[in-house]
Structures are given as structure tokens and as C-alpha cells.
């Protein structure tokens, strides 16, 4: 069985490490890379072409929504997006932007 390629874009180091750790416990996922801001995330997504992208909504250089709008035209593979944030106020917008799911930080197993 092929593993799902995963990428995480999040400026919160602790949240990024926690999610990476939890994903590492599941044999279905292979974490291919992480990025700490939108600019790095854009490069990571193009390089890795993840099946599943965990994307923080609020980052210092651009929002996750802005990043998604920037890459939308260049994603030619089937990539699912999980918006990952501490603020539930973004849930409706995330779904409108074609989010596969929405995960609130901090998450619990």
C-alpha cells in the first residue's frame, strides 16, 4: 500500500512538531516536509506534490487562504487540504476555499 504524502505549513513550531509526531504514528502517512511560512510552503508544495496538506490559516507573511489562492492554478494533482488553526472563525471560509477538512489547534488524539 502506498503511503499518503503529507506536507505541513505552519509558523507555530510546537504545533508543527506535535502534528508531525502524531502523523508519524500512523503508517498510512509519510511526512515529506514542513514549512514555517507561506513562501516556504509554496516551494514545498511544488517540490513534494503532497496528497494531503495541513495548512495553518494565520502566518506572518501570508494567510493560508492567500497561499491556497496563489497555488490553485498550479496544482495538477489530487491534493486534499486540511486547514489547521487555533481559530474556529475561519471554518466557513476554509470550506468555501475547498478545504477537505478543518482541524482546530491544539488538537487531541
Language-model region placement:
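CheY-like receiver
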Residues: 42-109
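Conserved Asp/Asn-Gly motif in the active-site loop of CheY-like receiver
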Residues: 32-39
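A generic structural motif
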Residues: 27-31, 77-79
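Conserved sequence signature across two-component system core domains
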Residues: 9-10, 35, 53, 85
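Conserved acidic segment of CheY-like receiver
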Residues: 3-14, 19-23
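Alpha-helical interaction/dimerization surfaces of two-component signaling modules
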Residues: 22-26, 44
